[in-house]
Amino acid sequence: MVRAQRTKRASVTDIYKGCKASGTCPPDVLNKVEQNTLADKILKYGSVGVFFGGLGIGTGKGTGGATGYVPLRPGVRVGGTPTVVRPAVIPEIIGPTELIPVDSIAPIDPEAPSIVSLTDSGAAADLFPSEAETIAEVHPTPVDIGIDTPIVAGGRDAILEVVDTNPPTRFSVTRTQYDNPSFQIISESTPITGEASLADHVFVFEGSGGQHVGAVTEEIELDTYPSRYSFEIEEATPPRRTSTPIERISQEFRNLRRALYNRRLTEQVQVKNPLFLTTPSKLVRFQFDNPVFDEEVTQIFERDVAEVEEPPDRDFLDIDRLGRPLLTESTEGRIRLSRLGQRASIQTRSGTRVGSRVHFYTDLSTINTEEPIELELLGEHSGDASVIEEPLQSTVIDMNLDDVEAIQDTIDTADDYNSADLLLDNAIEEFNNSQLVFGTSDRSSSAYSIPRFESPRETIVYVQDIEGNQVIYPGPTERPTIIFPLPSAPAVVIHTLDKSFDYYLHPSLRKKRRKRKYL
């Protein structure tokens, strides 16, 4: 049994936050938070006229009084100068690095006069813009253009770089391709009659001749690659236990298994009802089907503990909470679906429900591995087409039935044939299960069913052969009825001699009398 956990009571501040907005706070909570109690009022009104500052009255430990405080001594320790942190790399100077002194190019003579006289330039400067004189110089085209020839001294050969006077023009070619995922061309096809959806058609004519273009080709042995429809059947491999193992997930699964399979704290119940896989709520209580509700979540069932309610399944008695499904692996290697439930068997006065934890589980059956079979290609694809022209399917013969020549036949027949004899159809038509309709299209018609008449079965007459063969006619056969003997004595022995008792008590059930010894 799981030990009940004690619920912590809410503090005064939490109660005040929840009830202040609705105005339902108790008076003691409201006065304590707003500092309006009797003690707060005494301190508030009493501090107006009375001052207790020098008496050392306080809630903490105080030395108190005029002689209790120690005066400050004159010696005060002065801290040292803080250390300046210097950068390890010398920063670069921002701005111009070279400083040019004033008049460093043309120094002033110290004996020169300090007053500089103005010099008249003669003509006044024209401050307005004017047209500038432009001289066009045309150079004649040289007749002979000299070519620079590099001269190499020594015993080496000269390498001349010849440059074309008219270099070729360079072009940039780009190509853009748009893929259409809804259109797919299959290069291989099977002879299936249908509509051709390819845009490329190749016509090969026989006897038209040919021409070989290019040099003599080299014969290369080609290999046969498998088509897109060929496949290989893989051999059956043992089923894999896990995919990518992760240490953290493995640790969480170990903790989960430790919580589910702890027999001291958790009750183990195996469920065989198939509703546990889809709708486990139907095993806890009787209810209607709700197609919108999702069963793959944690479900809480509110009920009164005082009321006795019998669940559909006895194993789910007093279930208050049923967890979400968990998929684990059993010891036999099968998939196990588990749900952790909580019973509410006892309810205290404070509203706390006490109950044990229950682990409901069911094991899924093993799926046997079937032998793989080779599948055949079915259906039509783009490119599988045989186009048939309609004029080639039928033949039209135009003739007059009245002008028919004489037909030669081996049997002696009449030489005169008319159109009615040629159109005569000797086929036997059947009108079984047909309807005969009387009336016109203007009014409602009446339908009459023609019954199907069948000829009776022919009577078979057996004639006895006199040449020695014997005909055996079927006849009724009577088998003797076997009567099994009944037991003469009944299986239960009933004593009817003694009529003083209405029941029979076995001697072993009678009380033994204690024998007393007489002195």
Swiss-Prot record:
Entry keyword annotation includes Metal-binding: no
Entry keywords, A to Z: Capsid protein, Cytoplasmic inwards viral transport, Disulfide bond, DNA-binding, Host endosome, Host Golgi apparatus, Host nucleus, Host-virus interaction, Late protein, Microtubular inwards viral transport, Phosphoprotein, Viral penetration into host nucleus, Virion, Virus entry into host cell
Keyword DNA-binding: yes
Any one GO molecular function term: DNA binding
Location(s) in or outside the cell: Virion; Host nucleus; Host early endosome; Host Golgi apparatus
UniProt-listed HAMAP family: PPV_L2
Assigned protein family: Belongs to the papillomaviridae L2 protein family.
The protein's role, per its UniProt record: Minor protein of the capsid that localizes along the inner surface of the virion, within the central cavities beneath the L1 pentamers. Plays a role in capsid stabilization through interaction with the major capsid protein L1. Once the virion enters the host cell, L2 escorts the genomic DNA into the nucleus by promoting escape from the endosomal compartments and traffic through the host Golgi network.
Designated name of the protein: Minor capsid protein L2
Organism of derivation: Human papillomavirus 23
Gene (UniProt): L2
